[in-house]
């Protein structure tokens, strides 16, 4: 009796070691072998695979410049390869937040780009926020279609870490620009955004880029119940976003009679990479944007890492200063103390394991140090 030849699996047919996950799946359903072979033949290697076979299951992130907002987003900031929307009223800090994200990407050796559809980009303000102007790409497109085409080309290059579009409301379709003022152009911008999202989503997912859309708010007419607020550009952006951040100004910061900043509340109204509806509050100064050290003091006090007695701030046996401003300056001048507080705050929030050294390990380290000193 002639034995039937064994059907080769997609990986085995090429002499490649079979992934354990794929092996388990094929043992459960042998009939999948032919289907998987056909899929890989038609669409190439890696067109379908077990999730565990992926080399990377964690999502890389870029910090927002605010530790409380990073924690609200899931611990590390905004995710790469995803679409993010930052929206809110005028002068709430949307562009400042987006530029801080760009500055943080540059600090880690990345490249940031801004597509300035509003034609209102201020280089001097960006520099104060820590943005390196020499490595910042800036484009001021003449139409919405041009802006989205530039964005698509930057994403497909896989060389840009953050692409900021400022703003969705200013992405004017070409037909509207070529028409007369007063002409009706119903749904043109929503159609532009819908088509752009369909084209961009796949390319963004395969890249290292985080695309940040800044958006304004409008009010719907005749709404009796619920919030009348909405954002321009239709519903497509809301659906395709992985994170949506609602930024609001909730108070003023004063030095005597002079207003030196504002208190900002950011609510994560949508999050596909962490639990949504978390809220972060932080200070945004008029001199240099988000106060990282001020935010760290608030979080440290809240998580009992930093003790506050009256107006004095104390970390362990170290007095940080009397008053928040002096304590903030102390942390700026002592980055090692600031980093230590940051790690303990993250550990208290459950985002990293607390740094602990066993007694045996510390004794070994001392002995090693003595041996080196005596040699």
Curated annotation (Swiss-Prot):
GO terms (molecular function) for this protein are: ATP binding; ATP hydrolysis activity; ATP-dependent DNA damage sensor activity; damaged DNA binding; single-stranded DNA binding
- UniProt-listed InterPro entries: AAA+_ATPase, DNA_recomb/repair_RecA, P-loop_NTPase, RecA-like_C, RecA-like_N, RecA_ATP-bd, RecA_C_sf, RecA_monomer-monomer_interface
Q: Where does ATP bind?
A: 88-95
GO BP annotations of the record are: DNA recombination; DNA repair; SOS response
Q: Which UniProt keywords apply?
A: ATP-binding, Cytoplasm, DNA damage, DNA recombination, DNA repair, DNA-binding, Nucleotide-binding, SOS response
Source organism superkingdom: Bacteria
Principal subcellular localization: cytoplasm
Q: Which family does it belong to?
A: Belongs to the RecA family.
Name the job this protein performs.
Can catalyze the hydrolysis of ATP in the presence of single-stranded DNA, the ATP-dependent uptake of single-stranded DNA by duplex DNA, and the ATP-dependent hybridization of homologous single-stranded DNAs. It interacts with LexA causing its activation and leading to its autocatalytic cleavage.
Mind telling me what this protein is named?
Answer: Protein RecA
Species for this entry: Rhodopirellula baltica (strain DSM 10527 / NCIMB 13988 / SH1)
């Amino acid at each position: 009796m002639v034995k039937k030849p064994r059907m080769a699996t997609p990986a085995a047919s090429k002499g490649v070691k079979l992934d354990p996950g794929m092996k388990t799946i094929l043992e459960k359903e042998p009939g999948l072998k032919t289907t998987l072979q056909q899929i890989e033949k038609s669409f190439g290697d890696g067109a379908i695979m077990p999730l565990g076979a992926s080399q990377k299951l964690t999502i890389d992130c870029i910090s927002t410049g605010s530790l409380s907002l990073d924690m609200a987003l899931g611990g590390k900031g905004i995710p790469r390869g995803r679409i993010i929307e930052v929206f809110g009223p005028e002068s709430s800090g949307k562009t400042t937040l987006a530029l801080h994200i760009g500055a943080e990407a540059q600090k880690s050796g990345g490249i940031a780009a801004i597509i300035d559809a509003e034609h209102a980009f201020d280089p001097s303000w960006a520099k104060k926020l820590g943005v390196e102007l020499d490595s910042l790409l800036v484009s001021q497109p003449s139409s919405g279609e041009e802006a989205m085409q530039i964005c698509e080309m930057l994403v497909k290059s896989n060389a840009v870490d953050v692409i900021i579009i400022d703003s969705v409301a200013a992405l004017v379709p070409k037909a509207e620009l070529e028409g007369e003022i007063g002409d009706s152009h119903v749904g043109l911008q929503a159609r532009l955004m819908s088509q752009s999202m369909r084209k961009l989503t796949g390319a963004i997912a395969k890249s290292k880029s985080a695309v940040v859309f800044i958006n304004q708010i409008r009010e719907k007419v005749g709404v009796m119940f619920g919030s009348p607020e909405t954002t321009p550009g239709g519903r497509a952006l809301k659906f395709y976003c992985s994170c949506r951040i609602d930024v609001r100004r909730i108070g003023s910061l004063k030095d005597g009679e002079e207003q030196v900043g504002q208190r900002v509340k950011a609510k994560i109204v949508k999050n596909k990479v962490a639990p949504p509806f978390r809220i972060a509050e932080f200070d945004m100064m008029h001199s240099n944007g988000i106060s990282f050290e001020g935010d760290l003091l608030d979080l440290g006090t809240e998580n009992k890492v930093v003790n506050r007695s009256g107006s004095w701030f104390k970390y362990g046996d170290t007095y940080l200063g009397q008053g928040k401003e002096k304590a903030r300056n102390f942390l700026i001048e002592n980055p090692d103390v600031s980093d230590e507080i940051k790690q303990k705050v993250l550990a208290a929030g459950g985002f990293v394991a607390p740094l602990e050294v066993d007694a045996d390990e510390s004794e070994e380290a001392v002995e090693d140090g003595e041996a080196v000193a005596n040699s």
